Structure formats: C-alpha cells, structure tokens
C-alpha cells in the first residue's frame, strides 16, 4: 500500500496571492513529532519494499565500489613548520588516522598519531572531522568535529606533549579557526543558534572556560558569512566577510594577544575581494575593474595605490592565487576548463602548465611552505584518477607524488568528450561526458545527465570511481554546465540567477534534447540527477518535460523555494536573497513562484522518481522533499515509482565514512540500472 500523508490545508497570503499548502504540517523543527516521523518511516518502509527486489544488484554495486577503494591508503606527506604530516586509512577502517613526525626523520621512521578518527566516531552514527590546526609552537591541536550532520561543530583541544584533552568545549561553531602567533590565543567563528549563519568571531585563551571568551566581531547583516584564515606571512588573521555579491576584509595582528580588528577596505555594493600578505605586501583578488577579477599588489590600504599585476579579462576568470618567495601561481578558468600559470616575481616571466584531456580539472593543492620553489597541484579528468603533482618551478621538473589507486580500472577502456550545444536562445552551453568504449552504441545507451547551476559553483569534469559501475553497464554520463554555474566566468553565473534563473532550466532541458539527438543515449532511457539546488533543477525539469525522462534522482532537493525564502528563521535563508531574490518583492515573488517545483506540481504523468533527504539536513530541511513527495503522490496520474528515502541519522552530505558513504550511491545506481534493464518497477513485497 502506498504511503499517504494527511491533507491539512495551510493558507499563506502575500501580495494579494494566497497559496494553499496541504502538507505544511510536515515541518517539525524539533524532529520529534510522532505523526511526522511516522510518515517518514512509512515512506522509508515502502521504499525498502520496492528496492528489495534489487537488493542483490545493490549489494553487487556497493561491493564493486568498495573493491575500487584500496584497503590501506597513505596520503602524500607534506612538511609544515618542522613536521611532516600525513593521514592513512587502515584496512576496514571508515575514517582516517592523522599522523606527524619530525621533518628531519626518515619517512619509514615512527609516526606520532595526532588523531584516530575511527575511535572518535566509534559511538556515533555520523562523524565529520571539519578541520584541525596545530599551534605555531607545535604543542596543542585544535579539532573541529560534528557528530550529528547539522554542520554545527564543536572544537576541542589536545595537548600534544601530554596527550591530554583540555576541559573546554567550544560548541556551535564553524570549522574556520586560527591560532595567534603566541600559541595560546585562538580565534574561531560561532554560528547563530537559529539560522546557523556563521556571524561572530571570538577569542579564546587555552585552558579557560568558553564562557570567558571575548567577542571580537559580530556581523549584523544576515546576508553575510564570516570565515577566518591566516596570511602567508603569518602576520595577520583575516576576517573575511562575504555575501553572494559583496565582501569585506578585517585584519587582526597575529602577534598581539589583545588585537582589535581593523577594516582593510570598507564594503561597497558588488565589490568582491580577498587578500593575502607576504614579504611586506598585500596581494588582492578583486573585481573592482571587471567581473572576472584581477590581481593587485599594495603596501597600504589606500585603493589608489594598488598595483595591477593581472588585469581582469572578459573570457578568463581568475579563480585564485598562491604566493611563494620567488613565484606567484594563479588558477584560472577559460571556456569551462581550469588552468595554472606560474609567474616569476622578479622577471615577470609567465609559464603555463599544459594538460591533454578534452575535459578535466586542475587545482592548486596545499602548499604550506612559501619559501620553497616546489608547487603541488592536483589534476583529474573523467578518465584520470585524482593525481597529485609536484613541480619544481625553477627547473620545470615534474613528478607524480600520488595518484589515487583504482583496482581494476583501465583508462583506455573509456572515452571522455567535451561538447558545446546551442540552447534555445542561441547561447552555447558546454557539456562534459564519458562512456565505456566497448559498450557505446549510438542511440541505444542509457544516458544519465547531471546538472546543478547555482551559486556560481563549477561542476568540473573530474574522476569518479563509483561512476564506473554505471559506465561498465553501458551508461553514458554527462554533465551539463548550465548557466548559474561558474564554468564560463562571472557573467555565466549572473545569467542563471535572480530573474534569469530559468536559463538554468532551459539550458539543461535543451542539452538533454541535443544529447539524445546526437545519439549519446536512447530517447526511452534518459535519466536525470541533481542534488540540493540541482534537485530544484530536477523538480523544474519534470514539471516542464516529464516525458523526456524515464527516471530521475533528486538528492536533498531544494524544491519549496517561495515558502523557504519567505521564512528568515530557516537556516541560510537570508544569505540566499542574493542568489534567488527576496520574495517580499512582488516581482521576485511571482518569478520564483512560476518555477518553484513544489508550487508547480500538476495532475500529469511523471517519470520514475527517487528522492533522498536527511532528517538532520541543515542546508535543505527534510520537510521540503517530504512535502514535495506527498504532493506528487496526491496529484500525479501515472503508476510510476515514487520513492522517498530519509536517512534518519544524517544531514545534507548523507552518511559518513569512506565505505558507508557509498551505501546511498549504490541504492541510487541500482535504481537507475534496474529501470534501464526493465526489472523495476516490481511489486513490493508485503
């Protein structure tokens, strides 16, 4: 018997418009009301019964994925402040063990264990280590942990000389924290208790109660997020304040125990900048003269004194930079692909780093020692596992430090492509795709199309060892780099937000049509997948073109756009006004309502649909997908599968652990494979 949620009408009126929400009652901020939990359990039980027929397939896929993970894995060590650091995974362990040794030791000598995350996680269903930081004198470790999956971290401190933990706990914090140079003062960011926005900077002295901590800065504008880091010079603690369109930096002297923050450059609307400091100069990435950012250098805060090192360019986005004593390395993006350039700080000679794959991603890795000439950078493509390189910038010599081992994987068996399709308004949209060479048959393969397209985030064409379980079964996997993402620069992002949000949806649907027309998939075997804001994309796609898809997976989907954006008590809502708009404005209200998936469910046939959520999700509250599924059950006219799977122990990121985290992936893949093979839907067992 299908789950059925009670219909309890709830009227919401704004701008003279009344919306009736029959499933508003599914919202329970306490996550404890029996009727709500009972409905979620009904949906879970139904989903388990439906998928029981595919348990063997799901188990097989999970085993395939886990078999591609080396049982014992050791990271490439790095040296910082006189110590060599690494983390290792031991056979059968879900979490990493973090270790260090003197930089003067040989790597085969004994390592000191800083943290065994397996022991920390032993009594919890969920565990996330958000970050650790060790004092400049190497004696105390700060550790941020989340045991609930709400991204509300607690920070604890351990004396590395005695092994003892200090008594204090800093709770409800962001995993963004910095030690002052005296190794005793600690700066951290606290979250708002209701909205969970990171909004306050506090100063803590080791060994004292958290109640004695001093508030250093509080952000009053609830569209801004607060984060911390230390400059390369170690002279400053940076308080970075950022909304979606504007930023400001305040600095603390890292040498002073009682430092007070000062503004580097006051915020002004639509000016975004970030900075670093090294060798008595500030280096700034700023969009003051162009949307795609330029790089500037100065000794003082006066903006008139900024020296332009790299001008903003129309078709190249400056994404980041890293400072070395003799070199400056920049990370850029052009026509959807990332690239790296090294610039000699004395001669201004520029050297590019070349790559061969048609679709790939590269990034500047962790480089904690600026005095070196050795650059670490990462590389991945849809057919190349993550690879860490070390480049001697003085000589040009390059070596592989580590490539992720994937047992049984042979790159020659797979082919990746980078295409451009033309959307309905004439704009070219990039698509990255990959498939197994031997299994590709033009016009006959199942095609899975992934989309996101929000916040200016770029969905790069990187490697996935779990995805191989689909490719090896004949799936073609495609990523549509729709407007609203950052793949083609700032304008690409702006053309898919606010009152242009529908470009995101149109790009995705037009790309699906084009891929089918080009023969990358069978029209009867087209599947869609997206999560969070990409889940909203899924909701819009099936409202507008349900016949296009055989099956859809919506992961933790943001689908009740108007109601959520009208409720400023919901975590993150106010910070989203500069992404979607504020529906208190009638123009934005009408526009958002016209595409919001929940508000546009109609009596029509929908494709097979698997929806996932986590009870403790802090980014997209569980009741959004729950309400959406309930409304779909009420109105849809087909007999296709509709499954809602709620993880009662996790949040936005799903299960934790390097093996357990793939249980949900295996279920999703089994759902897709079974649909493609015609073994779903099956009559669920009672």
UniProtKB/Swiss-Prot annotation:
Q: Which family does it belong to?
A: Belongs to the peptidase S9A family.
A molecular function GO annotation:
oligopeptidase activity
Task: Tell me the function of this protein.
Answer: Cleaves peptide bonds on the C-terminal side of lysyl and argininyl residues.
What's this protein's name? Protease 2
Keyword tags: Hydrolase, Protease, Serine protease
Q: Which SUPFAM superfamilies match?
A: alpha/beta-Hydrolases, Peptidase/esterase 'gauge' domain
- Residues at the catalytic site: 532 (charge relay system), 617 (charge relay system), 652 (charge relay system)
* Residue intervals passing through the bilayer: none
Q: Which reaction does it catalyse?
A: Hydrolysis of -Arg-|-Xaa- and -Lys-|-Xaa- bonds in oligopeptides, even when P1' residue is proline
A biological process from GO? proteolysis
**Class in the EC hierarchy, top level:** hydrolase
For this record, the Gene Ontology CC terms, alphabetical, are: cytoplasm
State the EC number(s): 3.4.21.83
Keyword Hydrolase recorded:
yes
Top-rank taxon, per record: Bacteria
Supply the source organism for this entry: Escherichia coli (strain K12)
